[in-house]
A protein has these predicted regions:
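Hydrophobic alpha-helical connector segments
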Residues: 65-110, 127-130, 134-137
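Short, basic, alpha-helical segments at the C-terminal edge of helix-turn-helix-like DNA-binding modules
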Residues: 58-62
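Hydrophobic alpha-helical bundle segments that form small-molecule/ligand-binding pockets
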Residues: 112-144
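Short acidic alpha-helix initiation/capping motifs at coil-to-helix transition points
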Residues: 31-32, 108-113
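Generic alpha-helical structural context detector
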Residues: 53, 57, 88, 135, ...
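Helix-turn-helix
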Residues: 8, 12, 16-50, 54
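N-terminal intrinsically disordered/low-complexity leader segments
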Residues: 1-4, 15, 64, 68-71
Length: 144
């Protein structure tokens, strides 16, 4: 039997997600897939919401290749490329946008967000409008 760790659970959950979709993704089905008892999953994830948050993070880590601006990049180009990359990441898994829409930023993503805001501020945005611009792009891509 393979050692059950967080990465193994996430990989199996992403496979299952593609097969059955978000509404049918249950911890019971995931435990069956992993050949473990359901409580074993709670060692790694407190609840289904925590699992879904981890899935959203994994999708972005795997496929969102333009989350940071390039040196001397125009802010318009960055926002466009960021949106396209974000969209590609969410479309790479069934119900990816729905899963991401229910998440909140987590500590590992704070640095990325701060870099994006600093970049936009250096391009002439005030901090408030930089956040608005990033949120607008995110909401446009996700559809919320």
């Amino acid at each position: 039997m393979t050692k059950l760790d967080k990465g193994t659970v996430i990989a199996a959950a992403l496979e299952l997600l593609n097969e059955v979709g978000m509404d049918s993704l249950t911890t019971r089905k995931l435990a069956e897939r992993l050949k473990v008892q359901q409580p074993a999953l709670y060692w790694h994830f407190q609840n289904k919401r925590a699992l879904l948050d981890a899935l959203a993070e994994a999708m972005l880590a795997e496929r969102h290749t333009r989350s940071l601006p390039e040196e001397n990049e125009d802010w318009r180009v960055f926002l466009k490329e960021n949106a396209l990359s974000f969209r590609t990441a969410l479309l790479s898994y069934r119900d990816g946008a729905r899963i991401h829409a229910g998440t909140r930023p987590t500590e590992p993503n704070f640095g990325t967000a701060e870099t994006q805001i600093r970049f936009l501020c250096a391009e002439g945005f005030c901090p408030k409008r930089a956040v608005w611009a990033l949120r607008a792009v995110s909401h446009y891509v996700v559809g919320s």
